[in-house]
């Protein structure tokens, strides 16, 4: 029997679709793209709207920053959602998560009035990635592989080397323990998984920090799936695939003007990296690393249990080429230069006039007490200060309840055009914040006096 509903479906005009889409976003701010599309089909069963057209329609929604979008400036709409694993109330009592309408996704807002210089929270990375500028210090045991604290000399007496390889060194036993899930997981330790050596050498030789992030995400999930309580692997799956903003790296780079010239080389490079990752973290039964990898999984299991093979669904979710591109895009969107991926920090949206400052402060820093606020922001780091990759989140000025907390993703000293181009290439959107709107009519996008 023919589907009369499908036969009767019509393609709505933009004049009808866009207002409906705006109402849909407003009424369901917590839903992702695919769930919104499903809701649209429920609300308007008479319409035929493909996922491709639906995504294009979302690109005409307001840009991040609160201004109005220029229809000629299409944005990439990231898939995002809420991360139920983060206890925001205990980490940052004066902050709450909010889902915004108009394609903006999630963000953070103030629950109470915040004073200038007030510390909102501190946070360590849950996935640690190193700046290429740190490679020589790390390989010479002059820096902690977990927190990036500098040593006064190589391998100081109180430090802890990795017991299995010579590529990682730590401040103390605590940093070493943290590293097993965030910076130096067993599945990427060359002493335990020899095939990881060529992968990590490739990453450092090429300065592929985003690939390092993908490798450590996969290694952490695989380790938690094999050795820890099942709940941890499920929690991480929700964080990655439902909680963090992501856009396929291929979709991002297809927006580049030179894509038609570089696409073949980029695809070949991505396929090569994907194969390397798979051989290290999920080798096939015919690969030479398969048996050593199985022995490693058994040796690290608390009960020395035989590994349970990944299901077809798990392989597709974590190790397919399409998932690799999604993870690569996710790391690119969420990675913080000073240390890697931070769970709560990743919730903050961009503004060219941010009200939040993110700092790596000396370990001697003491937050101001409530009765001493407001205070000036801490001075710049001085030579000799002992810092780490722990982030300290500070209010730049007074912030009212309900006001969104924003940071700048780019150098605020750049001109309007430079900032917007950098944001488009790095994060997929054209900024329409108040500052960009004010500077729009000025020559060269320079900031007003």
UniProtKB/Swiss-Prot annotation:
Its EC number is 2.1.1.-. GO terms for cellular component: chromosome; cytoplasm; nucleus. GO terms for molecular function: histone H4K20 methyltransferase activity. The keyword Transmembrane helix does not apply. Transmembrane segments: none annotated. One of its GO terms (biological process) is methylation. Keywords: Chromosome, Cytoplasm, Methyltransferase, Nucleus, S-adenosyl-L-methionine, Transferase. Pfam families: SET (PF00856). It is found in: Nucleus; Chromosome; Cytoplasm. This is Histone-lysine N-methyltransferase SET5. It comes from Cryptococcus neoformans var. neoformans serotype D (strain B-3501A) (Filobasidiella neoformans).
């Amino acid at each position: 029997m023919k589907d009369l509903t499908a036969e009767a479906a019509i393609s709505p005009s933009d004049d009808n679709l866009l207002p409906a889409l705006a109402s849909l976003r407003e009424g369901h701010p917590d839903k992702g793209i695919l769930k919104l599309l499903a809701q649209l089909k429920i609300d308007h069963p008479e319409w035929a709207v493909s996922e491709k057209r639906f995504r294009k329609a979302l690109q005409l929604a307001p840009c991040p920053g609160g201004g109005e979008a220029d229809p000629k400036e299409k944005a990439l709409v990231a898939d995002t959602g809420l991360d139920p694993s983060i206890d925001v109330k205990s980490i940052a009592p004066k902050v709450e998560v909010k889902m915004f309408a108009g394609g903006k996704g999630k963000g953070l807002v103030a629950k109470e009035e915040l004073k200038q210089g007030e510390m909102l929270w501190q946070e360590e990375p849950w996935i640690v990635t190193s700046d290429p500028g740190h490679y020589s210090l790390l390989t010479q045991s002059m820096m902690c592989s977990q927190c990036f604290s500098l040593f006064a000399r190589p391998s100081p007496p109180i430090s802890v080397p990795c017991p299995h390889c010579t590529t990682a060194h730590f401040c103390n036993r605590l940093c070493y323990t943290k590293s097993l899930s965030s910076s130096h997981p067993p599945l990427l330790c060359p002493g335990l998984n020899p095939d990881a050596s060529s992968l990590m050498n490739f990453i450092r030789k090429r300065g592929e920090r985003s690939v390092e992030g993908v490798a450590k995400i996969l290694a952490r999930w695989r380790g938690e799936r094999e050795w820890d309580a099942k709940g941890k692997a499920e929690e991480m799956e929700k964080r990655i695939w439902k909680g963090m903003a992501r856009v396929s790296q291929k979709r991002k780079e297809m927006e580049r003007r030179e894509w038609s010239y570089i696409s073949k080389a980029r695809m070949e490079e991505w396929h090569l990296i994907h194969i390397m990752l798979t051989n290290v973290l999920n080798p096939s039964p015919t690969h030479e690393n398969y048996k050593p990898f199985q022995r490693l999984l058994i040796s690290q299991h608390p009960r020395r249990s035989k590994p349970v093979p990944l299901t077809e669904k798990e392989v597709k979710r974590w190790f397919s080429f399409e998932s690799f591109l999604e993870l690569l895009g996710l790391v690119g969107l969420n990675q913080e230069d000073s240390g890697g991926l931070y769970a709560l920090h990743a919730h903050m949206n961009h503004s060219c006039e941010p009200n939040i400052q993110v700092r790596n402060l000396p370990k001697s820093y003491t937050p101001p007490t409530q009765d001493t606020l407001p205070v000036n922001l801490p001075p710049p780091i001085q030579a000799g200060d002992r810092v780490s990759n722990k982030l300290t989140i500070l209010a730049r000025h007074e912030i009212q309840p309900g006001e969104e907390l924003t940071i700048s993703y780019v150098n605020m000293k750049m001109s309007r055009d430079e900032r917007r181009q950098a944001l488009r290439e790095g994060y997929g959107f054209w900024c329409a914040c108040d500052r960009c709107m004010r500077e729009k009519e000025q020559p060269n996008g320079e900031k007003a006096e």
